[in-house]
Amino acid sequence: LLGGAESNDHNLIRHLNPRCSITSCSSHKLTKDLVDKSDIIIVSNFINVPPEGLVYIQDTKPYIIYEHDHKYVKNRDPSAYPNFIVPESEKVNTEFYKKAKKVFVLSEICKEVLEKNVPSTNVHSIGCSLWSEETFDYIESLLNEQKENDLCILKSSNPIKNYNKSLEYCKENNIVPVELSEPIYQDFLKKMASCERMLFIPGVLETFSRVSAEAKMLGLKLLTTPKRLGFASENIYDQSGADLISSFRARNRAALEAF
């Protein structure tokens, strides 16, 4: 199962491919030659690009940052600091953000936090994750699934998803959760659709939380920590089911055209 950032990137590439010539590569495989051959660069995960590589992009090409996980903070979690104000000593890559033609973020809270910590950055919030129309259709087809189970949690080895903390909550409340870990995306969504509720306890400020949005599109009640959920900062957060699917379809179309 692809993570949220990877799924977003995949859907963006899929949208752009028919419109222009695209070369994609992992950050650790980026070369000067590839930069030189590009007219414009969309930078997503740049964690493995050496500092001199970022400077070269910054100095030679127009570029857009598609921001997923607060790479202007050393620990990649602005929620670790009061009011999301990151100490100067804990900031990184700030010039790279400032010099970008535009920085696309996924939620309003992430726009506010980035602007607060890296002023004069040109930030645009798309207010959503990216899904394909086929995925929206599939989620919609699951709306009438019988809710046979009470509560589900995300089974993930990624520590920021707080799987163990979710298990502790369930144990304390005498709940036997359905654990979502299916590698096939459609199976993952179908299993989620069989539940009444989802528990998700983010360990950091989630830039959006794709899985939380999917739970609400499927009509589940979401138990979470809203202050650490990018999705919760959006004015469609209280929607669910078909209404939320419709809102996300519209936002996805607008987001893709913005690129």
Give each language-model segment a name:
Residues 1-49, 223-254:
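N-terminal pre-catalytic "stem/leader" segment of glycosyltransferase-like enzymes
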Residues 40-42, 58-87:
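Active-site proximal beta-strand in glycosyltransferases
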Residues 82-103, 112, 193:
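Membrane-proximal helix-turn-helix segments that form the acceptor-binding/catalytic region
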Residues 98-122, 162:
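A short, active-site helix/loop in glycosyltransferases that binds the activated sugar's phosphate group
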Residues 130-188:
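Conserved catalytic-core segment of nucleotide-activated headgroup transferases in glycan assembly
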Residues 189, 212-218:
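Short alpha-helical segment that forms part of, or immediately flanks, the ligand-binding pocket
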Residues 196, 219:
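A short alpha->beta transition loop at the rim of the catalytic pocket in nucleotide-sugar-dependent
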Residues 200-211, 227, 231-233:
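Nucleotide-sugar-dependent
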